[in-house]
């Protein structure tokens, strides 16, 4: 058994890294060829804690925003090219907030530059306050050179590895501490001019005679206005070069004229009470590298906390294997005993009294309340399940690569539309299983109800993004394209699936007949009641994806590259297996206690518990301070959407597992 476990782990370990598709051809440059530098949106970075000189955490007033800003937003006053041109992007890239434009930076292969003046910009005090707020919140700039993100070199002390962290700072913060009771200067100019006054600004290592409760933290935001660009290239000979890495070292320098370019000067602090003249400059350096084009992404794709992921997956895999072994052994033994007892014909007795789960044979296939809604949710859940499974699989084997921006969400949209056939087939099949009379209503509502509700919520979130002037606003053209894809592809396929299921699906052929009068359900133990069973079952389902959710949220909210799809695929398979086993087990023991109302219970127990824990996890993920009402609404709104979709997917898994289990066991008994 141990060999099987380790073999399974090894197989999935080979899927933990994606690879580039051969069809993505590299760009070869010659000496002097222009290398386009593109600018993308400004994004929030993952939470970090300020530290003093002794390495101790220092609390600050850092707030975090969960929406991005357009690079050429008027409040930033960045240098613009003569003609700003928006670059073509995929549907997924646009929906996830990418806004890529050309830039005034001039990069030519092997032509190094030193302190080139870019432009002079005047930043009003009102915009300076906005920029300072984003600097304190840890916003990053995102550039692209030859398809590679501009990065900063970073070191992971936990794995003791060097890697390239995508993006670089909009600015830096310097943490100072002030003694309460002393007047803190109201302007940045006064603050820096009095920096030598020890009564006002103290070193991070405070004297022992200063009481801690009198100390306050002040963050000084330094705005970046100089960029040291380092382009790594691979020499292929015969004056052929390929870009294999881009490093940007941002510098904050206060200048009074564009000619001065020392990096050792005073940092630039934007005054929030007056206009600020800012000179933007950049330098370019080319560095030869042995890295070949095919492996240039390896430096960017860094696994954070791999030991935690391996430990959690191995630990939970062992738990699932033990759980499945116990469940299958106990369940199969009990069923074998039950079936042998139920199918015995005692010729000496005129009457034979049923007991256990066989008592529900006349009610277990009874039509539940709101059968239309349940069938639609189950069918939509199956459609989402197949979309998620195939998307993760394609990414794990390398068919979807970070080389192509927005490719994964685009693939997910297309797969969801294509799987409309399967989703509607499942929905109509379940509705026939319930023997519902309004099959045409089911055919119409299945491709509209859940997608329409999600689309409406996204549009509402879009208005909040629009109010915040975020680059994450989905353009009307993209929304129209989604609707077009929906009605021209998904809806026709859904109608076809419903019609095929209505004519060919035989799920309405039940192994037992339904009694005219429903059997009364006796008192149930507390652990089998719906609410308690839901929370208990949800622990097992959520445990299989808890660790991966952290990395997914980090990628979703803080622009981190997520590529550990092998881990994610393994976790999703564990989620599917765990949800199925636990739901079947609870359904079986409920039937043994004559509770034949399994339809809604299997969906709720399989889905609601996991979604509740997922939503709680998303709330606990926000250890940081959310900046503003809009950020809170957006975070809660999108977390609610993710949790609801999780509920539908796992609920469908639980329902279908219970449905096929019940059909199997009741078709194996003889009912007189």
From Swiss-Prot:
UniProt family annotation: Belongs to the nonaspanin (TM9SF) (TC 9.A.2) family.
Signal peptide (from-to): 1-18
Domain of life of the native organism: Eukaryota
Residue ranges of the TM segments: 308-328, 384-404, 411-431, 448-468, 480-500, 533-553, 566-586, 602-622, 629-649
Protein name stated in the entry: Transmembrane 9 superfamily member 2
Designated gene of the protein: TMN2
Transmembrane recorded as keyword: yes
Ranges in a coiled coil: none
Topology of the protein relative to the lipid bilayer: Multi-pass membrane protein
Principal localisation: membrane
Organism: Saccharomyces cerevisiae (strain ATCC 204508 / S288c)
Keyword list, A-Z: Ion transport, Membrane, Signal, Transmembrane, Transmembrane helix, Transport, Vacuole
Cytoplasmic side of membrane: 329-383, 432-447, 501-532, 587-601, 650-672
